[in-house]
Amino acid sequence: MGQKVHPNGIRLGIVKPWNATWFANTKDFADNLDGDFKVRQFLTSELKKASLSRIVIERPAKSIRVTIHTARPGVVIGKKGEDVEKLRAAVAKIAGVPAQINIAEVRKPELDAQLVGDSIASQLERRVMFRRAMKRAVQNAMRLGAKGIKVEVSGRLGGAEIARSEWYREGRVPLHTLRADIDYATSSAHTQYGVIGIKTWIFKGEILGGMPAANAVEPKGDKPKKQRKGRK
């Protein structure tokens, strides 16, 4: 049943960080959550060509800080920082509080599940054969140091009348191992035959010891019971 659970969700707090790190009271929680959703929706639509990996949102003291992880930071920043300033103003208007935008570059996009899935989707939309696109993505990931990768596509593959799923795997992808650093993402390709879904799993190795925050909290174990004399 390991394939039934979301690989990122089950590892939150163990080896995976959250994409939103803030605390709110009961009356503010819904507004903050709705604001996060609208900010992500806006940035995703605005930065379609920027190879967007993920968006991390923090809310320190009546403000919002957005970190954009992208493989093409120059596209996000724009000429002399004009584009990022427009994004900052738009995010501040959506969230209703002062905004700060940071850009983080993804050094190896071939090892990022979201970017790999988006790359396969763009190839399928350009009518590249799905098997060739999958194999190329798998080979690039393994060449750059991935321990394992699995790619699955589903839909009307090659324009077939009946939809089906096909997957390709190389190396190890241990979904049951919680300390395994597995990056998972979904993407979709809009072709003339319909929508093709793409799932990507990338195994980058095991993280021993867990996250630093998890290590800081020591488990409170029960004190060992004293044995009575004459008993073993």
Swiss-Prot record:
Highest taxon of the lineage: Bacteria
* Entry keyword RNA-binding: yes
Looking up InterPro entries in the UniProt record yields: KH_dom, KH_dom-like_a/b, KH_dom_type_2, KH_sf_prok-type, Ribosomal_S3_C_sf, Ribosomal_uS3_bac-typ, Ribosomal_uS3_C, Ribosomal_uS3_CS
Domain KH type-2 stretches: 39-107
- Entry's SUPFAM superfamilies? Prokaryotic type KH domain (KH-domain type II), Ribosomal protein S3 C-terminal domain
Using the UniProt annotation, give all residue ranges assigned to the region (Disordered): 213-232
Could you state one GO cellular component term attached to this entry?
cytosolic small ribosomal subunit
Record keywords: Ribonucleoprotein, Ribosomal protein, RNA-binding, rRNA-binding
Which Pfam families does this entry report, sorted A to Z?
A: KH_2, Ribosomal_S3_C
What SMART domains does the entry give? KH
GO molecular function terms here? Answer: mRNA binding; rRNA binding; structural constituent of ribosome
What does the function comment of this entry state?
Binds the lower part of the 30S subunit head. Binds mRNA in the 70S ribosome, positioning it for translation.
Q: How does it assemble?
A: Part of the 30S ribosomal subunit. Forms a tight complex with proteins S10 and S14.
Q: What is this protein called?
A: Small ribosomal subunit protein uS3
